[in-house]
């Protein structure tokens, strides 16, 4: 099964092509340019350089959130655009699960976390065994104190991954809870992780049409929160 995967949920952008568990190629960019300017040229160049075509892809996958509202709003429509012409099935992947797949080989409990600001993280916890993941919690936004309580209750060391991993590390180590960061090349979001998540979804019959694919924000954007607050003040 060939999968083309897009990752734009944070400051970096990446595109990967895989065949089953095997990574065929990946392009990663952290240049400061906007994802809207870099993503589609990256995808086109990756396919050209590998001698593959979009028609030859079986699945189009994308990190659908949580993450940067702007980034997710770029990635999901881009994936739809790739999928629609050939009516390709799509995998709207949890950004957190995709990151956890990057350390599934480590084993034990994994905490995938992204900085949600205001002393909160988007996070989910998984258990890795024999290269496979079992989800322990849903994706959610929560405070670091609440997450620390949950980890303490588990009683097990945590492998930390994601751009919020350093925040979680400080919170856990401050309470004497054992944890370890993934190395830099596996710490942040990658399209390869998205492709691994998509493969799991495909094998479990969880693919959707391009029309049905939607972002998963888990929280209102700042602009939406400010608008809601203003509407509440006006209604008083």
Kindly give the residue locations of the regions a language model identified:
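Surface "functional belts" at beta-alpha junctions
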Residues: 22, 34, 89-189, 217, ...
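Stable alpha-helical structural segments in soluble proteins, enriched in small hydrophobic residues
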Residues: 46-50, 85, 103, 194-202
């Amino acid at each position: 099964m060939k999968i083309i995967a897009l990752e734009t949920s944070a400051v970096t952008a990446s595109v990967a092509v895989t065949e089953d568990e095997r990574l065929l190629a990946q392009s990663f960019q952290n240049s400061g340019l906007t994802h809207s300017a870099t993503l589609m040229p990256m995808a086109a160049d990756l396919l050209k350089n590998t001698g593959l075509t979009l028609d030859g892809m079986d699945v189009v996958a994308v990190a659908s959130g949580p993450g940067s509202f702007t980034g997710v709003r770029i990635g999901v429509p881009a994936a739809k655009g790739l999928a629609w012409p050939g009516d390709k099935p799509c995998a709207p992947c949890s950004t957190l699960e995709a990151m956890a797949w990057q350390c599934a080989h480590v084993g034990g409990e994994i905490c995938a976390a992204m900085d949600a600001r205001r002393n909160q993280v988007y996070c989910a916890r998984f258990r890795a065994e024999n290269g496979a993941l079992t989800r322990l919690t849903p994706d959610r936004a929560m405070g670091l104190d609440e997450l620390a309580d949950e980890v303490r209750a588990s009683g097990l060391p945590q492998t930390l991954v994601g751009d919020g991993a350093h925040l979680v590390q400080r919170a856990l180590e401050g309470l004497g809870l054992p944890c370890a960061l993934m190395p830099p090349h596996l710490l942040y979001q990658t399209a390869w992780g998205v492709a691994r998540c998509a493969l799991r979804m495909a094998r479990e019959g969880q693919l959707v049409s391009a029309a049905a694919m939607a972002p998963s924000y888990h929280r209102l954007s700042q602009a939406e929160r400010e608008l809601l607050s203003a509407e509440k003040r006006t209604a008083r």
